[in-house]
Amino acid sequence: MALFQLFSFLNVTLGLVSNIYNSTGHLSIDKACSGYSTEVFKGVCLPSYSYVKVDRHILTKDDRYYLGYAKATNREYQLYSLHIGTYDLFGSDIMSCGARGYALGLHNGDLELVLNYCRKVDGQKHIGEVFQSCRFVEYSEHMISGIVHSIPKDLMEEFSPIGKVPYFGIMPFRTECADQCSTKQAFYAMDAYPFYNIGYWFPLCADKYIPLCYSGRTDPCPLGYEERLIKVHSYMEGFESGMKTVCKSGEYIFPAWYSGQSEIYDTVVKPYIVNVPEYCGRFSRSDKSLVYSRFGFRGTIFSGLKVITLDGIDYLTTDFCVNYSMHHYVKPLVFERMRKSFICTSSGCLYKGFDVNHLHDICTPKLIVKRHEALISSFSFINTLGTKVGAVPYDFDGNIIQFIDVFSIDGFYVYSLSHKKIQTLTVMLVQSEEEWYMKLLHFVADDILRECLSTVFKVLFSAISACLSFIIDVGGCCFRQFIFVCLDSVILLLLLLPNYTHLTFILGFTLNAYIQLVYYESCCFRAYRDIAETIDL
């Protein structure tokens, strides 16, 4: 089945609203470089993989899904697989025999990882097998204790290809051989069978926008929400549209609590950890997206994408643009930068900053999409695939806008991040404009002020000139020369201020005084004339 058909399947079960499952954890390979090596499995140093969260869109009580953590190990290597949600494709119970579906999660193998722990019984390979009777035989608390058990080597099927980098993606599975394994329950007890999945029925505790924590274990919807049936269309051949049960209040829609087949729930799904309020704190919203790596390509699963419907037409947009365009909430940085961009002077007030109109224009919904495909096509394996159909702003940081580029491939969409610098805009908002009589007053004031200043400076300079003349008359010519030397020294001092030293100032003052009073002809000393007469002789 083609990869994009898998996306189409996810559209059926996940395609309406966003519900974020957040978790923190660490997956790694113990002694990944140790000596297990065959033609199929090459010993490879697999890096540790930290996972943050997974986007899901809609899961209802009419679907079957669970969380699982699988671990297979022997002395040479370990296999980890974190299944965050396994979805039923054909309407059968994933806990029964013959069920088929796809596991969306974190794996450290190929997309079609081959597992078969019933090989000794049926001798056949299956893709991502899930065995009910084998898996949940002798259920006990030590199943989730993390105790490492050894697997009998004759039960191990070669993992092909296991030497791949960890990736986040989809793994097909089907449940088989429950009847065959049921006769071997003692042999396949958990002590000898460490590969397991622990199942929990949804919903998970989510963020404050989608309250998935209930007051009771059997309540289909929390207080304030009513149970509704909605029709979900299918894009898979041979699979008809179905009715899904959801909880609805205002604009919020999320899955109703699964309450059917309580006997299976009680025997298989223990303990009740996803529906207890004290566990809700573990599922708080953090980062906006999960960044993953697959076969050397990096991609992002975006949680900020939204599809909004205006006049019956579906547009792709983002949380940032919806909030910005509708003036409901904007990242504080936007308001802060706008506030600092307003400048007021005596001539008026202006705005000099990022182009607000441009930001508003590119956030206006324009990119028409198919609602379901847009919400589930959140994988960006290779950025250059498909035809680019547009871009939507994703975030704003300073003068840089981050965009999500949208590419179309066979009716589905691939997203990748890009960025662009927003232009600076200058707009005069308020300009000072005076009345005619104010201009006349300014003209009169200018003339009066000019005359006043002119008179003040004339009187001041006349007083200084009279003082200097009096000093020279009283002190004589030599005293005048000394005053000039002092004034020169003041100028010298100002020039020396950046690198002032006492020695430099004293030497400069002495040299200047010698030149002014001794070397040149002056009324104080006649050394210059005596030297000149001596040279002439």
Swiss-Prot record:
It is found in: Host membrane. It is a multi-pass membrane protein. It comes from the Viruses. The chain crosses the membrane at residues 459-479, 490-510. Residues 1-15 form the signal peptide. Keywords: Host membrane, Membrane, Signal, Transmembrane, Transmembrane helix. GO terms for cellular component: host cell membrane; membrane. This is Uncharacterized protein p61. It comes from Citrus leprosis virus C (isolate Citrus sinesis/Brazil/Cordeiropolis/2003) (CiLV-C). The gene is p61.
